[in-house]
UniProtKB/Swiss-Prot annotation:
Matching InterPro entries: ConA-like_dom_sf (IPR013320), GH16 (IPR000757), Skn1/Kre6/Sbg1 (IPR005629)
GO cellular component, as recorded: endoplasmic reticulum membrane; Golgi membrane; plasma membrane
Name of the protein this chain belongs to: Beta-glucan synthesis-associated protein KRE6
Keyword Transferase included in the entry's annotation: no
GH16 domain span: 299-694
Side of membrane Cytoplasmic, spans: 1-275
Biased composition annotated in UniProt, kind: Low complexity: 67-79, 121-139, 198-216
SS bond list: none
Top-level lineage group: Eukaryota
Recorded family membership: Belongs to the SKN1/KRE6 family.
């Protein structure tokens, strides 16, 4: 017998050369591969169970009283072991005839130290079976020619996922025993060993059982891998052979530490072509940058370091250019025609022009600090629940007019954007004649828009509710129920919190000038609206609402009409709206011409709107105009004491100007389909006249100061999100009427 071992072989093949006549094809030819983990035939179940029933009998010493038959059987088993130990390994690995070459199960799983078990199984099989000498290999698995052929080369076994490598030391005895059919092997071996005892002999049977139950002498445990039945020790990753990726699967801590110390040099020595190309490209870019930013400037340096010497030039003109074109040196606009420098008052006297703005300078902007006289706030006018956001972008000057543009542009989660300008704390005046020339937006018969030209006392800033809380629209100089919350009336005539800066404010409380009732009354030059006929018989017509907003209120909001004049009942009438719990409105409405609007089939002209007032308690009056025609006059006596309140004088506060274009459901029904966005409210000029002997222009007059008080409460005038006086961190001043 000869035994050769080819390390490239994957499947061990057994070839037994003997002088004895062996007719068993299972040993004379290459063994057909089959799954060593396949099910055994039913006739072998008892034998298989016995072969694995004991693990202690493998190393038992020879019994001193064993019979000759037992001794003979033992010698025969050792003889068979000698034959198996000289097994000749098969073809090279690339040409093996196992499972992966035929598409079937791999061949025998060879393991050193297990051949003694197989020899015992063979000798035991010869004692038990004498008749099946030439059993086909295909019947070993118990199928015996049936459709359940476990050696079908096109049907791989259930657990045979990897071929058994030649020379592997870690194939378990379990797989070998289940693969080598003990019954068939014993039958074939019995045919060539006639001297062995029969299976009926008790002694022989006992010896055979001991042989079958002997376990493998393999030093490796019979553990199992998670890959379906193979012992974990035979998993291919544990095979001791070199592969290109072994350094990934079996890292070497020593080599890794050495690599970390010299990572750069190691990578530099072992870089591939791609890495080399990247390195070369980086070097080229570095050299190019060095050449462009260092070498080239150094080569082209001219050495010019001579200091600058002023150049002399010829004076072409003696004209003195202004530093800034927007800066005005006079309150009267230079573009105002001289014919407008004077205005005839109600009593026939001529009042002089004290302020004007013709808006002839193109491209003026009105962001905070941009303009001398007007500022466009960036706020939502929440006092009247407007639907637009006032944005400085919507205000500019062009073609000699101030343009307030409203468009359907989403802004700050509102769907409309428009413009407002106000002269708060920049330009104020006390009594006089205010005249504004304007062209109203959209059509004259479409309701919904709210154009406004108005004025308000400087102690309140329009749109900043914290500043107006308790001062708007008060014009009151008494210490009685008129200064208390709700006017001390339970009937709901007033929801106002009371006059914050009243005449009887306690000492130590903040007040602009203690002892004088202060407030922020409102006088509207015009609030544009449209008169509609509910019957539908008359066409809609634009009207101008001209009002005095005041507090505290008369009973039922009705003043003494004996001191009110209307000049043309065909176009003007007293407003049916006289006020509400937040203000009393002494108002009249005047019909407007359709040609004074932006759109329409007729001409689009500008019209003047204004008011004139004197605040003397005895001779004072307030008169409104549309064009040069007066529409309504209210005398001071119309605001005499009523109920539990006293006189409400015409405003002595410094009044600031407000020009705006709004839209709100609180004002009028909005005819959305008929509004042609964008719409523009255009103002041609603003002019203020005063009696020559009573000129009072400024926001901080001596007798009615505002500056110090505003500075003491500046957050109320700069933060539109503060909606009440107390939200600004202040408390209402105490007064002597309630108790100091």
């Amino acid at each position: 017998m000869a035994s050769q071992r080819d390390l490239t072989s994957n499947n061990p093949h057994f070839h037994i050369s003997s002088s004895r006549n062996n007719t068993n094809d299972d040993f004379n030819s290459d063994h057909n591969p089959r799954n060593p983990f396949g099910d055994e035939p039913e006739e072998e179940e008892e034998l298989d169970s016995a072969s694995f029933s004991s693990s202690s009998q493998n190393n038992q010493p020879h019994h001193p009283f064993a019979t000759s038959n037992q001794t003979s059987s033992t010698n025969n088993l050792h003889s068979t072991n000698s034959i198996r130990n000289e097994a000749e390994y098969g073809k090279p690995f690339q040409a093996y005839s196992g499972y992966y070459s035929n598409g079937g199960s791999s061949s025998y799983l060879n393991q050193e130290g297990v051949i003694s078990d197989e020899s015992r199984l063979l000798s035991s099989g010869n004692n038990n079976n004498n008749n099946n000498n030439n059993r086909d290999v295909s019947s070993v698995g118990g199928g015996g020619g049936s459709g359940d052929n476990r050696l079908n080369p096109t049907s791989p076994a259930e657990f045979d996922r990897y071929p058994s490598m030649a020379g592997s030391r870690v194939v378990s005895s379990t797989s070998l025993v289940s693969f080598n059919n003990p019954s068939n092997m014993m039958r074939n071996h019995h045919q060539h060993q006639p001297h062995l005892g029969s299976s009926s002999s008790p002694t022989s049977s006992s010896m055979n059982n001991d042989s079958i139950s002997d376990k493998s002498t393999s030093p490796f445990p019979n553990d199992f891998s998670p890959f379906g039945g193979y012992p974990a020790s035979s998993f291919p990753l544990s095979i001791d052979e070199k592969e290109p990726d072994d350094y990934l699967n079996n890292p070497d801590p020593v080599q890794d530490a050495e690599y970390e110390k010299n990572r750069f040099m190691h990578d530099l020595k072992n870089m591939d072509k791609r890495s080399l190309g990247g390195l070369i490209g980086f070097i080229i870019l570095f050299i190019a940058a060095l050449a462009v930013f260092i070498i080239l400037p150094a080569l082209t340096y001219s050495g010019a370091t001579n200091p600058y010497h002023p150049e002399s030039y010829e004076v072409l003109t003696k004209y003195s250019y202004p530093m800034l074109s927007a800066i005005r040196m006079n309150l009267v606009d230079p573009d105002t025609p001289e014919s407008a420098y004077k205005k005839k008052a109600k009593d026939g006297s001529e009042w002089v022009l004290v302020f004007s703005d013709e808006f002839d300078a193109e491209g003026r902007t009105f962001y905070e600090g941009d303009d001398q006289f007007f500022t466009a706030p960036d706020i939502h006018y929440d006092a009247t629940k407007d639907l637009e956001w006032y944005d400085p972008d919507a205000v500019t000057t062009a073609n000699g007019t101030l343009n307030l543009r409203m468009d359907a542009y989403k802004n700050h989660n509102l769907f409309y954007r428009s413009g407002m300008v106000q002269s708060w704390n920049q330009l104020c005046y006390t009594q006089g004649h205010l005249e504004i020339s304007a062209r109203l937006p959209n059509y004259g018969n479409v309701t919904g828009l709210w154009p406004g030209l108005w004025s308000m006392g400087n102690l309140g800033r329009p749109g900043y509710l914290g500043s107006t809380d308790g001062v708007w629209p008060y014009s009151y100089d008494s210490c009685d129920a008129g200064i208390t919350p709700n006017q001390s009336s339970p009937d709901g005539i007033s929801y106002l919190p009371g006059q914050r800066l009243n005449k009887c404010t306690c000492p130590g409380e903040l007040h602009p000038n203690r002892g004088v009732g202060r407030g922020a009354p409102e006088i509207d030059v015009i609030e544009g609206e449209v008169m509609t006929d509910s019957s539908g018989k008359k066409e809609n017509c634009g009207v101008a609402s001209q009002s005095l907003q005041l507090a505290p209120m008369d009973i039922w909001y009705i003043p003494d009409y004996n001191w009110v004049e209307i000049y043309n009942f065909s176009v003007s009438t007293m407003n049916t709206y006289t006020g509400g719990p937040f203000q009393q409105a002494l108002s009249a409405t005047t019909m407007l011409n359709v040609t004074w609007y932006e759109f329409g089939d007729n001409a689009h002209n500008f019209q003047t709107y204004g008011y004139e007032y004197l605040n003397d308690p005895e001779t004072g009056y307030l008169r409104w105009f549309v064009g040069d025609d007066p529409t309504l006059t209210v005398y001071s006596q119309a605001l005499h004491p009523d109920g539990n309140i006293g006189w409400r004088p015409l405003s002595k506060e410094p009044m600031s100007l407000i020009l705006n274009l709004g839209i709100s459901n609180n004002w009028a029904y909005i005819d959305w389909p008929s509004i042609s966005f964008p719409v523009t409210f255009r103002i041609d000029y603003v002019r203020v006249y005063q009696p020559p002997d009573q000129i009072n222009v400024g926001c901080d007059p001596t007798d009615f100061p505002t500056y110090d008080y505003i500075q003491q409460h500046l957050n109320l005038y700069e933060n539109a999100n503060i909606t009440s006086f107390e939200d600004g961190g202040y408390k209402f001043p105490k007064n002597s009427l309630i108790g100091c």
